[in-house]
Every structure is written in C-alpha cells, then in structure tokens.
Amino acid sequence: MSYIAFDKEKLVNINFAKEREILRCSRSGAFATTTLCGLNTRKYHGLFIVPQDNFNGERHLLVSGLNENIVVNDMDFHLSIHQYKGGAIDPKGNKYLQNFSADSVPVYDYRVGKFNFQKSMLFQHDADRLIIKYTFLDKVDEIALQVEPLLAFRNIHQLTHANSDVHTGFETVDNGVGFCMYNGYTPVYFQFSAPVDYEHHPDWYYNIEYEEELKRGYDGHEDLWRPGTLTAKVKGKELYLTIGTEPMDAAEIAKLYTSEAKKRTPRYNFASCLKNAAEQFIVKRNDRTDIIAGYPWFGRWGRDTFIALPGLTLAIGKISLFEEIADSMIADLKDGLFPNIGAGDNASYNSVDAPLWFIRSLQIYFDHVNKPRKLWTKYGDVIKQILCAYRDGTMNNIRMLENGLIYAGGPGLALTWMDAIVNGRPVTPRTGCQVEINALWYNAIKFALDLARSSRDKEFLTDWEPITVNFPAVFKDTFWSKEMGYLADYVDGDYKNFQVRPNMLIAASLPFSPISERLKQLVLKRVTEELLVDKGVRSLSPKDPEYKGHYMGTQAERDAAYHQGTVWPWLLFPLTDCMLHVYPDSAPDVLNRILYRFDGCMTYYGLSTVAEITDGDPPYKPNGCISQAWSVAALLYMKWKIEQVKK
C-alpha cells in the first residue's frame, strides 16, 4: 500500500477530491497544480505554469489543462472534468478513475469499459518541460488518444477572457505543434512520442468556473483558448506527451521520462514527504537560486526565505545550497534591507525583520560548520552594512533609538511578519519597538561580535560592544510586565500593547536572548497555555476580544483573521529552539509528538506537504497556500534538532 493513495470511492467523490490538491514542480520554476480529481477550482490551478523572463520573471499560467479523450474500438471516453458558470460539472472524467498513488510520481489508474490504463506525469528536473506518460495495460484492437490544449497565457493572479488579440496560428514540430497566444511569451510545444495528426479549429472555451475564487470575492470565471486537436494512435504499451517551452526530438521523450523518474525522491513515509516538499521550493534560474515562499500564489519573499533557509537546506544536509541561496539574496541588499517581495526595479523593501532573520540563519549555519573566520570574511561586510543601516536609520523609519532599541514603521506600514493590510490600514498595527525585532537585533549584534572577536576585528568590537552592555536591562524595562507575567508585543512611546501573541516566543528562543532564564520559562508557559495547538502556534490568544478562530470569507475577511488567531506552523521553529533550551530533558519527546501530528496532513489539502496556516479553532482546518516553505522548513528543523539531541 502506498503512503499517499486513494481508491475509486474517494476519487469519484468530487467534494472529497477537490479538498485535496496536487503539486509538481521543476527546479527551473515551472509547476503544475490541481485537485485530486483534476478539477481546477482556483485561478492558480493549471497544468503548465512557467516564469516568463519578459515579464520580470513572474509566473504565468500557459496551459490550464487538457481535454483528453480515449477512443477505444470507436468508443469515446472523455477523461477531463470542468466546472462551468453556475456550478455545472461536465464531463465527469473522474468517474473512470480507479486508484491514485504518489510514491515517486503521481499515477492515476483508469478503467474505461473493460480497458485499463495508467497516466503519470513529472517535470524535467531542470527545465520548463512536463512529461505525461500513458501506460496501456490491456490489448485492444484500436486505441487513439485525442488531446485538446486549453491555453490561458496570463499571470497567475489574473484571468483570461475572450479577446481578438490572440494569435490564432500554430507551428508544426516533430510529432506535434506549438502555440503562442501573445507577443512576449515563450511558445508552448505539445509533442507525442508517436506520430500525430493535428486538426486546427481555433476557438474560445467559455465560462470555466473557479469556485475557490468566488469564495474569496474575486472574479471566478475564465475563457480559455482551444486551438485544435492532436490525435495519436497507440501502438505498443506506452505513449508519451511532453509540454515544453522549446521543441525536442520526439524520439527522446520516453528516454527523458525514464531518466527523470529515477531522480525522484520516493514518498514512502512522513519524513520522505517533507524532504520531497522541501525540494519543490528551490528554484534555480538565470544564475540565481531562490526559495519560493508558497504554492500556488507566492513568489520569492525575503523574510520567508531566511526563516525557511536552515530547515530547507542545513536540516537535510545541503550546506552548499544554503550558501547559494544566501548569496543570491545578498545581490539585492539595499540600504541594509532585503526585498520583501519582488526583485530589481520591482523590489519592495518593506520588511524590518528580513535582514535580522538573515543573520539568524547565518548563526544556525555557523553552529553547523563552526568556521567563524571564514564566515566573517565572507559575510562580515554584509552584516556590518545591515547593522549600520539599522543604527543610522534606513527606509520605512527603521532606526535605532538612543537607548539602543530599534523603532520601525509609521502610518499605513506593516513591516513585520504580521503584515496584512485591509483598505490601506494594517490589521495588526505594530508601529514602534516590536518585541521580536529588538530581540533579533540584540542577537544579531552579539553574534557579529563573536565572529569579529575570532577575526580580531577591533574596530567593530569598539563600535558595537557598548550598544549591548545595557540592552538587556533596557529591553526588560521596555517590554516586561511583572503584573502581566509576559512581554509586551510592541511599545510606541508610552503605549504598551500586551496582546498575547507569539512574537515574544521568538524573543525567548534566540541564542543571545535579552531576557533571563526565568522570563524565558514564563514566556514559554504563556505560549504553550494559550497559543500552542496541534498544528502550530496561534497568532493571537483566544482570550483576546479581537481573536478570530476561522480563516474564511472574502479576501478582506481572511486578511482580517490572518494574524488574529490563525495558526502558523512556521512558529514551531522558534518553539523548538525555546523548548530545547528551557527544558532540554523533556523537550525532545514533547516536540516529537508535535511533529508527528502532521503525519495525517500529508493526505489532506496539499498532498505530501504542509499548508501555510490553519484555523485557530478545532479541528484546525488547513488553509492559505497548499504548500508553504517556512511550514515545511519548521518541521524539518524540528526533526533535525530532535535527532541532534538524541544522538
């Protein structure tokens, strides 16, 4: 029995199947995603989604799907499934499904009449190319496969509607055809491993409906371009179809599939699923190596990159990959800040914590490699640039106060990870001195001082040691309340916000924490009593009148709940460090129990991966991105740290 598997009863149940989503990716940044039964319920669902260099590297959905028709002894069996305006579903190709498994690649077992066949797919590891394999298990006199491409050629965040600008032509290639709907795009080539007949009948396919978009208050209807039909007659047991941005030798398609299948990480248990999921976030393109923050809609985020970096690389033994990603991000450093989203001219530097998480990730890297001089030589100038920018002042009113604390933000700005904005106003306003930012700041300076001391950088020591001397006392005086028994979330002048949030957990988790051992215990106690649940850590205590236990409704309603009680698995990263430090003897077993609560998540929502968030209230339904980098990274980090302690 496969670890990830579903039988016919589950596959023909559309309500069951559409709550489970499949994701497959290439390291070049291309990916495919849909529901278990193949019904696209989001505008982000598609068969071939590819970064477009002519559009700032943004991901564009080129191929929404295929209308597939198996012709067996002159009988038609339509395998596709679509939902149309008003909710009508036709055809219902999922009725032919018998089994699904995903050991190394996703495999669907079909039965049409008395004829059985399999369909599997994978991406070429390092290219924008998808390969679909059809394996025919029974001998039949005559079989043909008819495929109609359904094209969109649009940004993943937008929708296509019928228009007269589309290019109606096609290009003939080896055993296939190519299409390009608009100028500036890479063409898409459909090629079979066998000879193909192509009938060109260009037209629009109207009113496809995406119900998840309607739930979020967005336009949920799309028209897709259907240029024609490719027909391949089956001779032998196997037939391959490749979809790529460049044509290839059709005779090599089968060999390429076989070669790529051998490279896949099998999904035979929970741990292997996490490792496989980690690999899907890594994109190597145009001389960069980046982390995709979450599928299907997030791109590269600075904050997410550095929080996820140790778990996605060091925790699974990929030290050189850590360096590749860090070096790629450093290229975009500006005024001591990393882009929160975007790159180049489209970069947005609205993150106060990304640079501090960068230094924290270097600290974990240092703990792993223990080469202080090498680290200071390679990254010392970058660390200095960041620290000096914060001390002297940089964008978005990020600056050091006279007492050494960092102040950040202003009207309309949301610079921490609690960054949701609705109607121009932050849902979680935190302008001022934020508790985790100042703890990360202190930790960054102390770590840098250790590195500088090993390299005898006397000038740096002279400049920065004085800042740390009184910092713990200032921090405690600013954030601690003996009456409350925990740390304030942020302070702005005389105002102190004492909502119970997980940011104080970050402050208590750091190697150079500005608080005492006793205060760490009290912070951890508060977090475990009010915030820790089965699938992560709540963003706000349910005792708070602003708490929202469910993430649902329109996008504005969801954003209003995003950091107001919603559970975040990534916070298990600082929880791991804090628990192992405060309770080193009992923590490993406690953390191990938390870790394996996610085992059941591998067969729900995003298959074989971990979601971005869950509801704050039971049963903690997963939501947001189906696969989130820092969620997966937190679990891999937790697993890694538990194993280190138990050695």
Regions found by a protein language model. Name each.
Residues 139, 160-163, 172, 181, ...:
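Aromatic-rich carbohydrate-recognition surfaces in CAZymes
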Residues 322, 461, 468, 520, ...:
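Solenoid-repeat scaffolds in large eukaryotic assemblies
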Residues 389, 433-458, 463-469:
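Aromatic- and glycine-enriched pocket-lining scaffold segments that form the walls
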